[in-house]
Amino acid sequence: MINNLSISSSLIPDKQRGSVESQVFYLTNRVLRLTQHLQLHGRDYSSQRGLWKILSKRKQLLVYLSKRDKLRYDDLIGQLGIRGLKTR
């Protein structure tokens, strides 16, 4: 079991704990932990549902941020190393 999957909290300053970036940061950490859990326990369907809910919430926040401030969105995607939103 790998314990080093969490992202460094130094990416988010202390004064911005409620910002969209910090919320996406914490949700990404939860996604990484749940993904690791589901690799060990593949048939844990309640955890799968929780993961889907977290991913949905993170996506909503990323859509909001991409509409409000594209530069902050691009910077956050780059720092966290997650895939950007699909565009139509």
Swiss-Prot record:
Gene Ontology, cellular component aspect: chloroplast; ribonucleoprotein complex; ribosome
GO molecular function: structural constituent of ribosome
Major site of localization recorded for this protein: plastid
InterPro entries linked: Ribosomal_uS15 (IPR000589), Ribosomal_uS15_bac-type (IPR005290), uS15_NS1_RNA-bd_sf (IPR009068)
Subcellular compartments: Plastid, Chloroplast
Keyword set, alphabetical order: Chloroplast, Plastid, Ribonucleoprotein, Ribosomal protein
Classification via CDD domains: S15_NS1_EPRS_RNA-bind (cd00677)
Pfam families named among the record's database cross-references: Ribosomal_S15
PROSITE patterns: RIBOSOMAL_S15 (PS00362)
GO BP field: translation
The organism's place on the tree of life at top rank: Eukaryota
Subunit composition and interactions: Part of the 30S ribosomal subunit.
Family, per entry: Belongs to the universal ribosomal protein uS15 family.
Protein name: Small ribosomal subunit protein uS15c
Species in which this protein is naturally found: Pinus thunbergii
Protein encoded by which gene: rps15
